[in-house]
Amino acid sequence: MTSYLLKNITVLDKTSEHNGKKVNVLIENGKIAKIGTAVEDAAAETIDFSGSYLAPGFCDLYVNINDPGFEYREDITSVANAAIAGGFTTICATADNHPITQSKAQVEYILNNAKNTPVSILPIGAVTENFDGKTPTEMLDMHYAGAIAFSDVPHSVKDSGVLLRALQYVQPFDGLIITMPFDKTLVGDGQVNESEVSVRMGMKGITNLSEYSMVQRDIELLKYTGGKLHFVGISTSESIDLIRKAKAEKLNVTCSVFVHHLVSDENEVKNFDSNYKVFPPLRTKDDQQALIEGLKDGTVDCVSTQHTPLNIDEKNVEFEVADFGIIGLETAFGLLHKKLENEISKEKLMELLSANPRKIINQTASTADFIILNFDEEWMLPEKNIKSKSRNSPYLNTPLKGKVKA
């Protein structure tokens, strides 16, 4: 296999003794073999990476792989190609497949079919059978088969007793429960954020209360049970305040926000572009700023894409009947860096995309989990270059800053 000598590349990894240094890196068989200022190899193909950075690959805690059951939207091969194009070397696959990932056999199906892909695809098992919110799954069996965590996303666990028992059940094997907090009875038929924008559009709104009321409930359950709880898709300022307080009380709680909530707000839906129809909905600018402040002070642990492939019949229809969802693996880095380059450091962005999500699921990056980044490159992603099978993104052909080079 060809060896490569990457010259004059800057290391961006807080765990490395070379962090912040310009080095040469020898790559053999796809792994880092040597790294240092004096590394040379006459037999290797030499590439000058002046101005670029060597960093651990990104990790996404919320990806819909759609395999098995919805392969017309995405499959394991296509999602792996989309992930690696966006710099993600590890992705966590939600249980929202058909059949739902709720047994040892279904966990093994994903792991076996992902073996020959360029990324690590880690299955998340369901908390309740068929997402019914009532009947617990065999979480222990799935854990031993390789499930990385347990979640009913895109649903919330509506029954408090079920979530309480799940938090207790997974503690002996240090399991993680992931939840997307929302009260379905308060969401109803809502389409967009409840505000002046929803009124002007004539659309039913989704209140902040529908989210933060469940955050409050889940935190109280965590106080009672102990264990570990991760909130995905936090979108409101009130939720951020509650999680900040819970962390101050030393509860074992973490949270992530979605890329689109950081880079877009509710004003994007005014023109009824269904590609901006996501759940939770895009919120106000004040909510968005609260999320950014949460990134800065550590309330928000990481950023996820909520990669949700949908085909044209599910998305390019009237706004009210369009499905919720957006693809995001390939544009995440360019969107985030463009939006946040004056708000957070490069090191902080790497924590949010790489170190922290791995810490939440007790994973570490291997010597093969590296990517090469150029923070200054401006580019756009045309539809013809998308690796995903689906095209449901409002960020195609829009200016991005920061590109994954390899």
Question: For each predicted feature, which ranges?
Answer:
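Histidine/acidic residue-rich metal-binding segments in metalloenzymes
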Residues: 137-303
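Active-site metal-binding motif and surrounding structural segment of the metallo-beta-lactamase
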Residues: 38-54
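Divalent metal-coordination and catalytic microenvironments
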Residues: 9, 30, 51, 62, ...
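N-terminal metal-binding scaffold of metallo-dependent hydrolase/deaminase domains
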Residues: 1-41
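His/Asp/Glu-enriched, well-ordered alpha-helical/loop segment
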Residues: 200-226, 296-297, 302-304, 308-373
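A glycine-rich helix N-cap at a beta->alpha junction
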Residues: 113-126
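C-terminal cap of metal-dependent C-N hydrolases
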Residues: 9, 318, 367-406
